[in-house]
Amino acid sequence: PPPLTAMMTNTAYNVDNFETLADDLQWYIERDWAAGAQRTDAPALVPFSYARYWHGYLIWLRPLLLITDITGVRVVQYLVLAALFAAVAVLLRRRCGLRAAVWFAVSQLLVTAFWAPHQVQFFTCFAVAYAGCVWVLAKPRRSDDVCLALLVLGVVTSFCDLLVTPVLTLGLPLVCWLLEPQQRLRAGTRQCGIVVGGSLTWGVGYLLCWASKWVLAGLVTGQNVIADALHQVGVRTAADSWHGMELTWRNILHFVYTTLAGKHLFWPLVLAVVLLLALFAASIRDRQQLARALPLGLCALMTPAWFIVLRTHSIQHGWFTWRALGLTVFAGLAFLCYCCDVRQIAKRLKRT
């Protein structure tokens, strides 16, 4: 259908999120009406390729487009994601308690997960992550089974995703597993090793699947897909530019400071952060409970760590990468609940 064709064409030509296909075409359509001649100062369109991705989402997108339009595709995706969301919430309620189900629901609503099915590229990671949560919660799982599942999830994510919010497929199933009663009984520093090991396993599956596409695409097309992929890795992890600003850490921090200071928000936010840290320190139950909650704390830090490693990509595409913070909210709420108790503040004040 024409609208879908237009969107595909726009995506093909529009890499910069802050320009549109219309802006590019305007250079070629406009005339110098004073001279009656076509404009000759149009910038050249630089060709690019997405051959480094598997584009696995086409497995369900193309068949659906044979029987429906893009609206129908969205309806199917909404139904699938709603069913998976409900399944995760019900299983969390049944196996981990009402609080866990509420944490999950709140975290996903805060990042507008309900909007993800509107776009195929946003839908993929949420669907894969929720499916992983359902598998984890279906019955008690051993740590080695979970690590193997994370390997599979890494492969599936790499196959279907376009580097949107892949960390969700690692963190959400892992948090669901850590919240299960039998894992809470074993909670502690040992599980931190499982979190790290599971993350490495997921990363191996993710990277190997992705790299295999580079090799196969190069063999089939004769193009140097590996060089292009490695170049893109460098672009997304090194300092690039955004709105004319080089994305070094110094420039990023200076931009944040000047933006907040210009709105007289910097020092109030600093004060709020200091107060929150003081409240956190004063409300910690004890060191043992803090250690038991530490694996959940590590999961909460996965998304910030991902943003730091891929800072250029995360900032330039912040309009969709921010939804990965749903993992931080989910794991963070669980971490705070297990290691903190506001009643501890009153007890400590009485002692002083």
Regions found by a protein language model. Name each.
Residues 1-50:
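Interfacial juxtamembrane loops and adjacent helix segments
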Residues 52, 59-77:
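Juxtamembrane segments of multi-pass membrane glycosylation machinery
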Residues 59, 105-128, 153-159:
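Aromatic- and kink-enriched transmembrane "portal" helix at the membrane-lumen/periplasm boundary
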Residues 316-340:
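Hydrophobic/aromatic-rich transmembrane helices and adjacent perimembrane loops
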